[in-house]
C-alpha cells in the first residue's frame, strides 16, 4: 500500500519499497501510483556502484572530462597556430585525468598508469603561457603559474619550491583534495639550467640546486605546507599535500638550444679526408622539431629532471600571417580590445589590412613574438586616445600602413563628414 487514511482523515503516504511513512523519511518521491523514499534511493545507488566492474567504460562514468578534440577546440579559440603542440597537450592532459579516474576504481592487481609531465619548448611570445592558462580554464581545475627564476634552494633568500604548492592551495581555498588534482605551470624553466656541462664544485643555489629540489615535487612526494600561508616554524601543524597526481607543465624559450641541436645533427669530421659540410641556416622551428633529451641535458637541465618530463611539445616561430591572425581572430584579440576601448567613447576603430601586416612585420623585427603586437598598436593610438575624450564629433578612427611605418597620426573621420559621404 502506498497510502493509508489516518485517524484525522488525512492521507499518509508510504514508501512502496520499505513501507516507511512520509513522516519517517526526509523525502518521498512520487511515481505513477508508487512512492520511493530517499533511503531506498541511496541503497539502490550503493548496489549499482558495487556491481559496476572496475574496467567499466570511462565514457559512462566520466561527467566533466572533455575529450582531446574538445580540449583542442577550446585552445583554438585563444591560441592561433601551434597545431602539433595543441594536439600533444590535449592528449597528454586527457590521459592524465583518465589515469586519475582509473586509479580511483582500479583493483590491486590492475595495471598502474604513471604520470606524464609536459615540457613546452618555444621562442618567446609563441603562446606557451597562454596554452597553459587556457588549458586550466577548460578543465576547471586548480591552476597556478610559478616563475622558476624566483626559486632558490631551501634556506636561501628567495622562494622554496614548496611555495608553488602553497599557491596552488590558495587558488582552491585550501581544499587539499582539489589541489592534489590540479595543474602547475612552471615558466622560464630554461633559466635554472646549470652554468656548465660538468657538475660544479661551488654551490649553484638558483640553478642546479633548484632543479634538484623540483625533482621529488614533480615526480610525487608529500609536501608540507604551512596553513593559510604562514611561515614555517617548529611545533606547527602542516597541511600534507600529495603531489603524485598534480600535472606539472614546464615551459621555456631555451635560447641557444638550437645551436646544441645543430652541433649534434650537423657533426662533421676533421682532417684532410673528412667530408666538408656547409652549415645550413635553419629556423628555430626546424631545429626544435629535432630536439632530443641529450640536447636538453647539454643545455643545462639535469638528466633526472629531463626524465621526469617525458612529453615534449615544441612551438613554432610565429610567421607574419600568424601574427595578423593573432591580431584579429582570438576571443581576446588585441584589435577587439582596442575596438572595445574606443567604442566606450562612442567611436569606431578601423585598422586596414596593410596596417595589420605592418604591425606583424614590426613585431617580427623586434623578435618578441605575439607580445610585441599590443605595444606597437598602443604606441600608434596613444595620442589619439589622449585627445578622444575631449572631442565630441569623432565618428571613426582609421589606422593605415603609414600610421605604423611612419608614425603618422591615425585618420579621424568626423560625424559631419560621415553624413555627407
Swiss-Prot record:
GO terms for biological process: cell division; proteolysis involved in protein catabolic process. One of its GO terms (cellular component) is HslUV protease complex. ATP binds at residues 123-130. Zn(2+) binds at residues 15, 18, 37, 40. PROSITE patterns: CLPX_ZB. SUPFAM superfamilies: Glucocorticoid receptor-like (DNA-binding domain), P-loop containing nucleoside triphosphate hydrolases. Residues 3-56 form the ClpX-type ZB domain. GO terms for molecular function: ATP binding; ATP hydrolysis activity; ATP-dependent protein folding chaperone; protein dimerization activity; unfolded protein binding; zinc ion binding. Pfam families: AAA_2, ClpB_D2-small, zf-C4_ClpX. Keywords: ATP-binding, Chaperone, Metal-binding, Nucleotide-binding, Zinc. CDD domains: RecA-like_ClpX. InterPro entries: AAA+_ATPase (IPR003593), ATP-dep_Clp_protease_ClpX (IPR050052), ATPase_AAA_core (IPR003959), Clp_ATPase_C (IPR019489), Clp_protease_ATP-bd_su_ClpX (IPR004487), ClpX_bact (IPR046425), P-loop_NTPase (IPR027417), Znf_CppX_C4 (IPR010603). Component of the ClpX-ClpP complex. Forms a hexameric ring that, in the presence of ATP, binds to fourteen ClpP subunits assembled into a disk-like structure with a central cavity, resembling the structure of eukaryotic proteasomes. NCBIfam families: clpX (TIGR00382), PRK05342.1 (NF003745). Belongs to the ClpX chaperone family. ATP-dependent specificity component of the Clp protease. It directs the protease to specific substrates. Can perform chaperone functions in the absence of ClpP. This is ATP-dependent Clp protease ATP-binding subunit ClpX. The gene is clpX.
Amino acid at each position: 500500500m502506498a497510502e493509508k487514511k489516518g485517524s484525522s482523515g488525512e492521507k499518509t503516504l508510504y514508501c512502496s519499497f520499505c513501507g516507511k511513512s512520509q513522516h519517517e523519511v526526509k523525502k518521498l518521491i512520487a511515481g505513477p501510483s508508487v512512492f520511493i523514499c530517499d533511503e531506498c534511493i541511496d541503497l539502490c545507488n550503493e548496489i549499482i556502484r558495487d556491481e559496476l566492474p572496475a574496467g567499466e567504460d570511462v565514457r559512462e562514468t566520466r561527467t566533466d572530462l572533455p575529450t582531446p578534440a574538445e580540449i583542442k577546440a577550446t585552445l583554438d579559440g585563444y591560441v592561433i597556430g601551434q597545431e602539433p603542440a595543441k594536439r600533444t597537450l590535449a592528449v597528454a592532459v586527457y590521459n592524465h585525468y583518465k589515469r586519475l579516474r582509473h586509479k580511483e576504481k582500479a583493483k590491486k592487481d590492475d595495471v598502474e598508469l604513471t604520470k606524464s609531465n609536459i615540457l613546452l619548448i618555444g621562442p618567446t611570445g609563441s603562446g606557451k603561457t597562454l596554452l597553459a592558462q587556457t588549458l586550466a580554464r577548460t578543465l576547471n581545475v586548480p591552476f597556478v603559474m610559478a616563475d622558476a627564476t624566483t626559486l632558490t634552494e631551501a634556506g636561501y633568500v628567495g622562494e622554496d619550491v614548496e611555495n608553488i604548492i602553497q599557491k596552488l592551495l590558495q587558488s582552491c581555498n585550501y581544499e587539499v583534495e582539489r589541489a592534489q588534482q590540479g595543474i602547475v605551470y612552471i615558466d622560464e624553466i630554461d633559466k635554472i639550467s646549470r652554468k656548465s656541462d660538468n657538475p660544479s664544485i661551488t654551490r649553484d643555489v638558483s640553478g642546479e640546486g633548484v632543479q634538484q629540489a623540483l625533482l621529488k615535487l614533480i615526480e610525487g612526494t608529500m609536501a608540507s605546507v604551512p596553513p593559510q600561508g604562514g611561515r614555517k616554524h617548529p611545533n606547527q601543524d602542516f597541511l600534507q599535500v600529495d603531489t603524485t597526481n598534480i600535472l606539472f607543465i614546464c615551459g621555456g624559450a631555451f635560447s641557444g638550444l638550437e645551436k646544441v641541436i645543430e652541433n649534434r645533427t650537423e657533426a662533421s669530421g676533421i682532417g684532410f679526408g673528412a667530408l666538408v659540410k656547409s652549415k645550413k641556416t635553419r629556423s628555430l622551428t626546424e631545429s626544435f622539431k629535432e630536439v632530443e633529451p641529450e640536447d636538453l641535458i647539454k643545455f643545462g637541465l639535469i638528466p633526472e629532471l629531463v626524465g621526469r618530463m617525458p612529453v615534449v611539445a615544441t612551438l613554432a616561430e610565429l610567421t607574419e600571417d600568424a601574427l595578423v591572425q593573432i591580431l584579429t581572430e582570438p576571443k581576446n584579440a588585441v584589435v577587439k580590445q582596442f575596438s572595445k576601448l574606443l567604442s566606450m567613447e562612442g567611436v569606431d576603430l578601423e585598422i586596414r589590412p596593410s596596417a595589420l601586416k605592418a604591425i606583424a612585420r614590426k613585431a617580427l623585427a623586434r623578435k618578441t613574438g605575439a607580445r610585441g603586437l599590443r605595444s606597437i598598436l598602443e604606441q600608434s593610438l596613444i595620442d589619439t586616445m589622449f585627445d578622444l575624450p575631449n572631442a565630441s564629433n569623432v565618428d571613426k578612427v582609421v589606422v593605415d600602413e603609414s600610421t605604423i611605418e611612419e608614425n603618422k597620426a591615425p585618420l579621424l573621420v568626423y560625424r559631419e563628414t560621415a553624413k555627407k559621404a
